């Protein structure tokens, strides 16, 4: 490999490392706002305290909930709804969603898990300030279920509705209806407020998703990096990351929102309104010493002035971050998926990598094979560039003696040296950066594949050969400590990939051979080993196979470049260097 190629690869590796550490796509984070710290309330055994009288308890409820106090007493009843994709548990206390277990996606230990973290109070709630100044959270109120069954099943295109009603008094009521479809992650959520025109202060209520999603992966630190609250309004994505346990993170913005959501690495819970919103509210906290981030994502909805009742419709999506699935919702929910820079890597991910992968998956079920085929296709596309690069490097090699003479002759005149070198490069048909051009062109693709492989659920828990999960490193041994840059494990795929990098350099024509090039021939594979050790195994597999195809391609080109082509190149180089050689002879005569 020539010096330019080595330098190009080294720069690429350096850029990748810096990019991963410091150059993550800028996120529109929530504004920091001062918030009073919440002290944990220690539960005291009931036997240790005297039970309050019924009158005292009623007075406390009335003081807290006002006219809604009567609804805060009741018996909780649950109903379990099962469709083709998940099993959900609804509660009459709050008419809320308490559990949702996916059927086709397991956690890192390959066991079913509940996505909803707020399983005690429930994830969904309506919040508002009553006309008498009471903060009302519907999860504190007992609804009446209109379904007598405790379990329901719906399949295929069938639909099933579960309704709850809360009669506040003779003129006011709240009705909440969930409608499930057998083959969909989408749940229709209908909220009817009857007779509330003068009961809600400010004519506004919030529909909240309370609680971050439970983590599903073994690597909790990595998943924590992907856990955010988000919203889409005004044509842009708002992201709030509660990354610092010492702060409370908030963002409150006005405008028309298409959705609010919370997500972990591979799953998302989103609320999509069907009428214009007043704005959004995001809130996030993280406990010190814990990787889990807790969020609230809320839509702010106005109560139409002059109306006594409102009937609002929402769509809930609680399920995998599958690009095609969330895009089919036509709500721009796919914008929550992190594919890097919108102007560079995201187009590669959305319009090249994912469509090709999805098309190939119709005929090939193993994603390891799909990655290999994809690497082969990319190599075919870059073949002309590689061929031109090889020919250019052979010419560069032939030019080395003359270039050294010119460097010696014009060592005190850099401008003249560059002028002469430029003339020779042009007349010889040489591009001095041709050696690294194919690699530079692939950089956006490689970065986009990094994002796709680490965040797309398509590769999750899909194996290939010894690799159990292509979306994470193929670790075969874990250390009791962590090595800087390398990590706390040994992965096989990066080792094989580094070996192919070495052989690719050995077989690639060098424009010049010096001590620096020899050092880089060993150093660069080591750098790539360190870099890829913590990358998804699928990405290392792609680069491994691309290198193998490159070695085969280079061997073929070395063997098939004809003597006539070599002679023509030599004549072109000789013609380009003739003026420099003539000048040298003329200097000797003097």
From Swiss-Prot:
Q: List the disulfide bonds.
A: none
Give the GO biological process terms. Answer: protein insertion into membrane; protein transport
> Can you tell me where the transmembrane regions are?
5-25, 368-388, 433-453, 483-503, 519-539
GO cellular component entries = plasma membrane
Subcellular localization, per the record?
Cell inner membrane
Similarity comment: Belongs to the OXA1/ALB3/YidC family. Type 1 subfamily.
Name used for this protein in its record = Membrane protein insertase YidC
